[in-house]
């Protein structure tokens, strides 16, 4: 098996979506995962060290990608940041959210894992 890739999931407050994504992929042998939020009030706020750790960043909405590019221009210059287009309409581990995360994230994770 190739090396594991480091996947960082990002939403606003690191409360429902990105922690759910982290839980969904926690035991996947292809990846190591973290989740962070872009808001100053996030449970775990994103820092430059998180971006340095990541091989792939999966954000829930366009606004998260824009925030990362604005706040961390040097750290994101060559980092793949993909938007999953998952709205903030779900609670932690909501079955529909889990399904959306798997459906949206899997192509990016599979592509990155294949390259690793």
Describe the function of each predicted region.
Residues 1-116:
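Short polar/charged helix/loop
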């Amino acid at each position: 098996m190739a090396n594991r890739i480091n996947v960082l999931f990002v939403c606003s407050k690191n409360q429902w979506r990105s922690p759910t994504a982290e839980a969904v992929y926690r035991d996947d042998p292809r990846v190591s995962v973290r989740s962070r939020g872009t808001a100053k009030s996030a449970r775990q706020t994103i820092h430059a060290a998180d971006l340095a750790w990541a091989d792939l960043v999966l954000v829930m909405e366009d606004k998260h990608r824009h925030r990362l590019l604005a706040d961390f221009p040097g750290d994101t210059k060559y980092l793949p940041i993909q938007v999953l287009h998952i709205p903030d309409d779900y609670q932690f581990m909501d079955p529909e959210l889990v399904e959306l995360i798997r459906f949206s994230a899997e192509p990016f994770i599979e592509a990155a894992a294949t390259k690793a």
